[in-house]
Design a protein with these regions (language model features):
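Metallo-beta-lactamase
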Residues: 1-102, 110-122
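Active-site flanking residues adjacent to catalytic metal/cofactor-binding acidic residues
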Residues: 73, 117, 146-147
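Short acidic/polar capping segments at secondary-structure boundaries
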Residues: 78, 119-121, 144
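Short acidic capping loops at alpha-helix termini that bridge into adjacent secondary structure
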Residues: 108-110, 141-142
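Metal-dependent catalytic neighborhoods of phosphoester/phosphodiester hydrolases
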Residues: 124-134
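Short, conserved loop/helix-junction motifs that constitute active-site signature segments
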Residues: 133-141
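Short internal beta-strands
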Residues: 140-148
Length: 148
């Protein structure tokens, strides 16, 4: 099921969603239509939406399995969170991410480490989940690793 095999290490992409984000002009300072025209043969329709002109980004984690540990790199957007700047992420109720993690053969209790590359909302959202009105760790047996 691994997307990549590096020796005896398996790496699997765990997708939460494909999301339209911003236009190339909004994201890249100085980006011009001519720059887009030079690359539209491979950007359309999978990386840029033909209808909106927005970039299509995979919101995903990487599941890393070694002989000794099960590691999750980033935890996507999550559910029941409040986001003012990305309305589509506000108060989501979709458990696709957890279902995809289980489809990859891992239960949240089996994660040993969660590596957070940085603390943007689309990288740490599933660090916690709402359960019976309380925020609890989604990966209760994991050690969470952050940079200083």
């Amino acid at each position: 099921m691994a997307d990549w095999q590096l020796g005896d290490i398996e790496v699997t992409s765990v997708l939460e969603q494909m999301a339209e984000f911003m236009t190339l002009e909004e994201f890249f300072d100085g980006f011009t239509p001519e720059m887009f025209d030079a690359h539209k043969d491979w950007l359309l329709p999978n990386a840029v939406s033909p209808s909106s002109g927005k970039m299509i980004l995979p919101i995903q984690s990487y599941l890393v399995r070694t002989k000794h540990h099960t590691i999750l790199i980033d935890t996507c957007v999550g559910c029941h969170k409040k986001f003012k700047w990305v309305p589509d992420w506000n108060d989501r109720r979709d458990d696709t991410y957890l279902r995809n993690l289980k489809a990859a053969g891992v239960d949240p209790t089996e994660i040993d480490y969660v590596f957070c590359t940085h603390l943007h909302v689309d990288h740490c959202g599933w660090n916690t989940k709402l359960e019976d009105g309380r925020w609890v760790p989604t990966f209760p047996n994991a050690k969470y690793i952050f940079s200083q």
